[in-house]
Amino acid sequence: MADHQTLRVIPLGGLGEIGKNMMVFELADDIVAVDCGLQFPEAEMLGVDLVIPDTTYLRERLDKVRAILITHGHEDHIGALPYVLRDVNVPVYCTRLTYGLISVKLKEHRLLRESDLRIVEPGEQIQLGDFTA
């Protein structure tokens, strides 16, 4: 039986590299992802337009994924959202400014209507299963 008090931290990108920021936190039956960024390809990656995090871990546990929290609106933190939300369509929490940036991006990809973007005001706390953010 798994220890339900153990916090698992799973980096899907952004460690030891510039860009592709995405960190997953898992506690019992709840998963929260922080950021969803892209990375621009290295020069030797001919024909590749952008690099996104491997979200297999999230897709395989979709029933446990409560949300994606966005720290700020830079591409290395929001750029992969149009690609990730196609398979992991969960609420996305962000500040008002970041909401505007994400909205434009999702509209360009024709995903704005089916996406669940939520604004978090300064000082506001949100409850996501066992997580408080």
Question: Model-derived features: where do they sit?
Answer:
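Pre-active-site segment of Zn-dependent metallo-hydrolases
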Residues: 15-20, 27-70, 82-90, 94, ...
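Short acidic-hydrophobic, aromatic-tinged amphipathic segments that line or gate anion-handling sites
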Residues: 116-122
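N-terminal Rossmann-fold NAD(P) dinucleotide-binding loop
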Residues: 77
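A short helix-to-beta-strand connector/capping loop
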Residues: 4-5, 111-116, 129-131
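Catalytic core of the metallo-beta-lactamase
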Residues: 6-12, 18-27, 124-133
